[in-house]
Amino acid sequence: IMPYYGVPVGQTDEDVAMGYNKIILTDLLRDELGFTGVVCTDWGIVSSRAWGVEGLTIRERYKKSIDAGVDQYGGESDPEHIIDMVNSGELTMERIDQSVRRILLNKFELGLFEQSLVDEQAVSELVKTQDYIDAGFEAQRKSIVLLSNKGAEAPILPISTGSKIFVDGLDPEQVSGFGEVVNSPDEADFIIFYLPTIFNGNQVPGSEELIDKFLSGILPDENLAFDPSILERAQNYSQKAKLITVVDLNRPAILTELNDMSDGLIGTFGVYDSILFEMIFGHFDPQGKLPFEIPSSMAAVMAQQEDMPDDSEAPVFEFGHGLTYRQ
């Protein structure tokens, strides 16, 4: 088990991160729940993300986390502190052996000492089988969420085969089997506009400020709204043809403006372009549902309770939303 980075605020006798919290790792996880396996920390909890124990030295952080119940460290590479504590008597070999037994047991059960190398020739037979490939494609089909499907007389989706299509952000070769790909939005009957997941620093290539936010944050917590330049491009597209906007939703995004501009709005979670086009052209009926709500604004995001999954004010799309072509 890998404990969470965060602090269980107000739930134990001290507000320290899970990896330093004896009540969580020993009293709850091992004694109450009966866990006997390895506790491996998330990456860098000693050197860079020591939430709740920032005032401790590196050596003290190692000692506290081991006393809490940690067996193995992710992303740390300085065992000298632990060796020194054993030599000085601060840590007993009995405690070290306790973790060693847990770690070695996993390796024994996997047979790593008897057969440490895999049979490379068998990989394609065991892993990349047609059944697994088909199951993966089917999972992608089931994951696509049709968020909105507008139209004056009839819903815009699915698109009729043979329509003139302009694509932005997707592989035009993949759509060529469904419709006529055109080189300009002015020539198109439909524009399919794909937007990747918002990770702040990826919106304006070359922007040092945004890239710093992305890279230094690692787990981004900045604005969920799209850059104004993207909204302007979508607005321009909407004035030239019917606009189908596709947004990858590895994390929620503010879709208020895009929903207003788009004739059709689709949420994806990392699918092949070909699978997406199958859905857009009606080869299968979408059935995906949102695993979270889509908030209406950043103000609504900031006002909601961080420990509640779907309590923002007036969300654009609620948790569990998802249309089908039959609706």
Residues of each region from the PLM?
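Conserved, mostly hydrophobic/aromatic
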Residues: 1, 42, 69, 103, ...
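Hydrophobic faces of well-ordered beta-strands that scaffold small-molecule active sites
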Residues: 1-3, 37-41, 72-74, 243-245
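Hydrophobic, small-residue-rich alpha-helical packing segments that form membrane-like cores
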Residues: 3-21, 27-32
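C-terminal non-catalytic regions of proteins with extracellular/luminal or membrane-system context
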Residues: 12-19, 34, 43, 48-55, ...
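Catalytic PLP-binding core of fold-type I/II PLP enzymes
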Residues: 26-44
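Conserved phosphate-binding loops in nucleotide/dinucleotide-binding enzymes
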Residues: 50-67
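Mid-to-C-terminal alpha-helical segments outside catalytic/metal-binding sites
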Residues: 93-112
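Flexible hinge/switch segments at interdomain interfaces of large molecular machines
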Residues: 113-121
